[in-house]
Each structure stands twice: as structure tokens, then as C-alpha cells.
Regions:
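Alpha-helical structural signal in soluble globular domains
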Residues: 66, 90-98, 122-126, 157-160, ...
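Core AdoMet radical
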Residues: 27, 47-56, 70-85, 95-115, ...
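Flexible mid-to-C-terminal extensions adjoining Fe-S/redox cofactors in radical SAM and related proteins
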Residues: 264-319
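C-terminal accessory regions of radical SAM enzymes
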Residues: 240-274
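Conserved alpha-helical substructure of the radical SAM core
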Residues: 2-79, 83-98
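Residue-level recognition of short loop/turn positions
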Residues: 39, 106, 261-263
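Short cysteine clusters
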Residues: 36, 40-43, 253, 268, ...
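Radical SAM enzyme [4Fe-4S]-AdoMet core and its adjacent flexible, acidic
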Residues: 138-252
Length: 319
């Protein structure tokens, strides 16, 4: 038991086979750095304009080789605002020659900045699946979490993506992500998606494919908020009480390997923030070219309760 009087996550899981990965994961997720044009209150990577841990060209090249050798199918790109990495456009074009599916997680408003306004067309041309963060469907709530002026810019970018065919054409997928604006669990995803679709279409004529409801994980900037407001213990107990073993088979960490900005390997992006590298001797993407990790035991922590609470945190398949 921890000081919170909550079992360690590993001990909580009775069916330990679900804490093992697939032998040949299909998804490679990469975090290209925490550089971002906004500073969100819930951000688990502490993203912001002053962050300097950008992934370098050499690491991108190692990722491409490892992706090919490992016969991965999906490349999942996150940050920060991944578009701000100077190698981003080049990498998208290169990896599109090898990946069946490319996912980019965007904050939307970076695509309204003049230096990045060409990227939506690149997404369209490469059939990139866009997973866009939109914490709510009205300005007041979004402003509290992401800052004043973010919501109208997000709406403008969504309109532009719709104009390019996103959310409308079969091969141009636009998914949105909801984060709770506080120390509570997200509502049921299906009902929330219906509300999002109605509100965004009725008010702005915006359409999208799916909504993913993410539970805020108690790490990074959100953890700082919880401790500052003396909410950490209560929130962890809330996650623990909502633990649902039925979520375990579908956890993305079971079918994924995650690469940090410096090329280090993790079971998920949350473990990257917690500095919990994968088990075994292979711990850098450059080693994947000549080594196969095989079935791995997933390295767990208390934050894993965030992905297994309630119906599970789909996260656009983040968890």
C-alpha cells in the first residue's frame, strides 16, 4: 500500500497477462518534444513556448529505420505541438512511405499561426488522421483551460479542416479530444460525442468523426495543480474507486512502443514523463534496428489508474 492507502497498480491487476505487451506491436508513438505555442493547465508533458527538448534529425532517421524493420503499421506523433519541430514536415513525408496509418495530435491553433498554415494541406495530401484537442464546445470553458482567444481560433481551424474534406471524406479522419476541466472523471463518451456533434454543427456547422474522452492523468502540470489545490489524494482515490478491469485488454500500451524526444523507449507517453523506461536491455530506438524487444512486461505506476478508470480513457487511443 502507498501513503495514499491505495494499492500499487501492478498489485491491483489480478490478470497479470494484461500487463504484457504483444510480441509484435503495431503502433509506434513518438513524442517529438514539449515545445508548444500554448500552456494548458492539464498538460501532462508541461508543454509550452520555452521548452527546448526538440527531437533532432538523427533520432527521426533512427525511428524510420526501426519502424521499417519492426514492421509497425501506425505512426502516432505527439508533442508539445508536434508541428513546431523543425523536422516535422520532412518526417511526415518520409514516414508516409512506410506507415499504413499516420496520426498527428494537434492543439489546432498552431495551424492558425502563419508559419504553419500550410500544414493542413500536407495532412490532406498524406491522408494523416488528425486528433485535435478541443476541451469543450463553448468558449468560456476552453478559455479557462487553454487561455483567452483559443476557442475561436480552434473553430476557425476546424472549419478549414472541414473545407479540405476532413470529417467529411472517408479517408480524411478528424477526431476530437475532450479533457475534464478539473479533478473529475469525464462523462460517458457516447453521450458527450452526441452533444459535441450537435453543438458544433448547430453553432458553427463543424463536423467531425469521433470524440475521445480522456481522463486527466495525475502527472505533469495537472499533478502540480492537484497538489497546489490539495486535491491529489481525493483525485487518486476517485480513480482507484473507478478502477475497471474490463479496460485492461484494450489498453494501447499493450500494442505500442513509445519513443521520447531523445530516442529513449517507453511503454507510453505518460511513462516518458514519469521517466519509466521499458523493461529489458533494449532502451533506445537505435537499438530496435538490430534487436527485437519481444513480449515485454509493461512498467506501471499510480498514474495507470487514470487509463483504467470507468469506461477507460480512450484518448484517441492514448491510453
Amino acid at each position: 500500500m502507498t501513503e495514499l492507502n491505495i494499492p500499487k497498480f501492478f498489485d491491483q491487476v489480478e490478470e497479470k497477462q494484461y500487463l504484457l505487451t504483444e510480441e509484435f506491436p503495431e503502433v509506434m508513438q513518438i513524442n517529438v518534444g514539449s515545445l508548444c505555442n500554448i500552456t494548458c493547465s492539464h498538460c501532462h508533458v508541461d508543454g509550452g513556448p520555452t521548452r527546448k527538448n526538440n527531437m533532432v534529425r538523427e533520432t527521426f532517421e533512427q525511428i524510420i529505420e526501426a519502424f521499417k524493420v519492426g514492421k509497425y503499421k501506425t505512426m502516432d506523433i505527439t508533442g508539445g505541438a508536434p508541428e513546431m519541430n523543425p523536422n516535422f514536415r520532412w518526417f511526415l513525408k518520409e514516414i508516409s512511405q512506410h506507415a499504413k496509418t499516420i496520426i498527428v495530435r494537434t492543439n489546432l491553433i498552431i495551424l492558425d499561426v502563419p508559419a504553419y498554415r500550410d500544414i493542413p494541406e500536407l495532412y490532406r495530401d498524406l491522408k494523416v488522421q488528425v486528433v485535435a484537442s478541443l476541451p469543450y464546445y463553448n468558449e468560456k470553458v476552453v478559455a479557462k483551460q487553454r487561455g483567452k482567444g483559443v476557442f475561436p481560433k480552434s473553430i476557425e481551424v476546424l472549419r478549414r479542416l472541414n473545407e479540405l474534406g476532413y470529417g467529411k471524406e472517408e479517408d480524411l479522419i478528424l477526431n476530437l479530444v475532450y479533457n475534464p476541466n478539473g479533478a473529475f472523471l469525464p462523462p460517458k463518451q457516447e453521450a458527450l460525442e452526441k452533444t459535441y456533434k450537435k453543438k458544433l454543427y448547430d453553432n458553427f456547422e463543424i463536423v467531425f468523426n469521433n470524440l475521445f474522452a480522456i481522463t486527466n492523468n495525475p502527472i505533469g502540470r495537472f499533478s502540480e495543480f492537484l497538489h497546489r489545490e490539495d486535491l491529489y489524494e481525493g483525485y487518486m482515490n476517485k480513480l482507484y474507486k473507478a478502477y475497471n478491469p474490463a479496460t485492461l485488454p484494450g489498453l494501447m500500451c499493450r500494442n505500442m512502443i513509445s519513443v521520447g524526444p531523445d530516442g529513449s523507449l517507453y511503454d507510453c507517453d505518460f511513462n516518458y514523463i514519469e521517466k519509466l523506461k521499458i523493461s529489458g536491455e533494449v532502451n533506445h530506438v537505435s537499438q530496435l534496428v538490430d534487436n527485437h524487444t519481444g513480449v515485454r512486461r509493461i512498467v506501471t505506476g499510480m498514474h495507470c489508474y487514470g487509463c483504467t478508470a470507468g469506461a477507460g480513457s480512450s484518448g484517441g487511443e492514448t491510453c
